[in-house]
UniProtKB/Swiss-Prot annotation:
Gene Ontology annotations for the cellular component aspect, listed alphabetically: peroxisome
Binding site for substrate: R360
Location of this chain's protein in the cell: Peroxisome
Lineage, highest ranks first: Eukaryota, Metazoa, Chordata, Craniata, Vertebrata
UniProt motif Microbody targeting signal: location: 390-392
Name of this chain's protein: Alanine--glyoxylate aminotransferase
Gene: AGXT
Keyword set, alphabetical order: Acetylation, Aminotransferase, Peroxisome, Pyridoxal phosphate, Transferase
Required co-factors: pyridoxal 5'-phosphate
Amino acid sequence: MASRQLLVAPPEALRKPLCTPHRLLLGPGPSNLPPRVLAAGGLQMIGHMHEEMYQVMDEIKQGIQYAFQTRNALTLAVSGSGHCALETALFNLLEPGDAFLVGANGIWGQRAAEVGERIGARVHPMIKDPGSHYTLQEVEECLAQHKPVLLFLTHGESSTGVLQPLDGFGELCHRYKCLLLVDSVASLGGAPIYMDQQGIDVLYSGSQKALNAPPGTSLISFSDKAKSKIYARKTKPFSFYMDVQLLANIWGCDGKPRMYHHTTPVIGIFALRESLALLVEQGLEKSWQRHREVAQHLYRRLQELGLQLFVKDPALRLPTVTTVIVPASYRWRDIVSYVMHHFGIEITGGLGPSADKVLRIGLLGCNATRENVDRLATALREALQHCAQSQL
């Protein structure tokens, strides 16, 4: 056998310990981790199929049911970010040829439409300008025209800062034999949502926003109507990894002995459990109130600086992610860079249809405090003094 030699030397960078900066993350996510969640990341590993792990998973299911306000048995966490939860929903609910109605008033509706197209669904996007929302009348007209099996709406559109009203949409969809799928990645814990009472058939969210857990896990729940559609599929879902019937088993949702499907992110699940425990300790209503009050404080401080909010109707503003019109004679990148380099605070620019139009400020979970707002206002005041472009 021919001898072999190493062609790649040990990287010098990996001889040094990892060192990361301490920053205040006031962008649209991820968010800073509270001490209890941070400590969960340092717990010792256990097996992903140990009884103790199943107990943690069962507690997470209860936490999701509380956060979503649902009694759905088919409730679980997905091993992946919010995008993974979106694809889990669509891969299991849609089959080729199904009509899919999509609220596309920001990047998340655009993404949902693209995934639907990849599945082979007949996608009907309801395209609206960024900053807009959907009314019951608008949606009913499209339901009557296209007769979809599924409607997608984004509750908290973090690319535009819009909070989509949800009351009445579940009942409307069911009247037209359509299921309602809602993205609450940016809104969960920060704005009221009632899955069962609002007739939402599939609701998903992410770990790294107002829940203040690391990215990498997402939350999802299915109504009995949605479960029936999934279990009556004529074709297998495109993804084995995201097959809900298989995920239901490892999460103890089907009443059968749990079997191996994939290796779940044990430490990430520990962190998610602790983040949900913190939400339970605080209480949903207090969390919603705190986000609302701190967002109002942010609006006042921004207006004192002469900045304009992108979403004009206060009732439609997402309290967790605020969009601010980039002022004339400024480049958004300059403001973002100045605030980061001089104050160690992250904010971001727009995304998708709001790119180059807005700055985005996140007040997520433990980061939603008046003190953080005041600290950011100081940073923005200085940035506006130093970043103006010449009008010549």
